[in-house]
C-alpha cells in the first residue's frame, strides 16, 4: 500500500500603506506592483505561507507559526522562500516528495495572470519538482468579504505528498 499524504493550508494578510513611494506585494517570491503592501512580520507572502502550512499539515508537523514565530526578531522580514525550503527539508527528511500542489489566491487586485509562470517556477525550484506539478490560480470573491473590499489577500494550498522512491 502506498502511503500518500494530503495537506491543506490557508493564509491571509491585510493590505497596508508602508509609507514608501513604491508599493508591492510578494507572492510566491515574485514582487508584484500594487497600490499597497502587505502587513506582516515576514514578507507577507500568502502563497508560500499557505503552501508551507499545507506541507507541514500533511505530515502533522504543526504550522509555520510554530516553526517561525512572529515573536522571534530573527523572522522579521523573512524571505518566505527560505521558510518554504526549510519546510520542504522536513518533508524530504520524513521520506516524502511533492506529488503536486494546487494553490488558489483570492483577491480583486493585483491581477496575477501576468505573473503566473514566474510564481510557479519559483515554487517548482524551491520544491525540487517540475513546474507541471505546481498550479497557481487566482480568483476574485465578486467584491464580497474582506478580499472583495480590497482589505487583504488570501491563499489556499493543497498538496499531495508521495513516498520518495529514489531515497534521495
From Swiss-Prot:
Organism of this sequence: Psychrobacter cryohalolentis (strain ATCC BAA-1226 / DSM 17306 / VKM B-2378 / K5)
EC numbers for this chain: 4.6.1.12
Biological processes, Gene Ontology terms: isopentenyl diphosphate biosynthetic process, methylerythritol 4-phosphate pathway; terpenoid biosynthetic process
Lineage: Bacteria, Pseudomonadati, Pseudomonadota, Gammaproteobacteria, Moraxellales
Cofactor descriptive note: Binds 1 divalent metal cation per subunit.
CDD domains tied to this protein: MECDP_synthase
Cofactor field: a divalent metal cation
Protein name (database record): 2-C-methyl-D-erythritol 2,4-cyclodiphosphate synthase
Pfam families documented for this protein: YgbB
Amino acid at each position: 500500500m502506498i502511503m500518500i499524504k494530503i495537506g491543506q493550508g490557508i493564509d491571509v494578510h491585510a493590505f497596508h500603506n508602508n509609507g514608501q513611494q513604491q508599493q508591492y506585494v510578494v507572492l510566491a517570491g515574485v514582487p508584484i506592483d500594487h497600490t499597497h503592501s502587505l502587513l506582516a512580520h515576514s514578507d507577507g507572502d500568502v502563497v508560500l505561507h499557505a503552501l508551507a502550512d499545507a506541507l507541514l499539515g500533511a505530515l502533522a508537523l504543526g504550522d509555520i507559526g510554530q516553526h517561525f514565530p512572529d515573536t522571534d526578531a530573527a523572522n522579521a522580514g523573512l524571505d518566505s522562500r527560505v521558510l518554504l525550503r526549510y519546510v520542504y527539508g522536513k518533508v524530504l527528511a520524513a521520506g516524502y516528495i511533492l506529488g503536486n500542489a494546487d494553490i488558489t489566491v483570492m483577491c480583486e487586485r493585483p491581477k496575477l495572470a501576468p505573473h503566473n509562470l514566474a510564481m510557479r517556477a519559483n515554487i517548482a525550484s524551491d520544491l525540487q519538482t517540475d513546474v507541471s506539478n505546481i498550479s497557481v490560480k487566482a480568483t476574485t470573491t465578486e467584491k464580497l468579504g474582506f478580499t472583495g473590499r480590497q482589505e487583504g489577500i488570501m491563499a489556499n494550498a493543497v498538496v499531495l505528498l508521495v513516498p520518495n522512491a529514489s531515497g534521495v
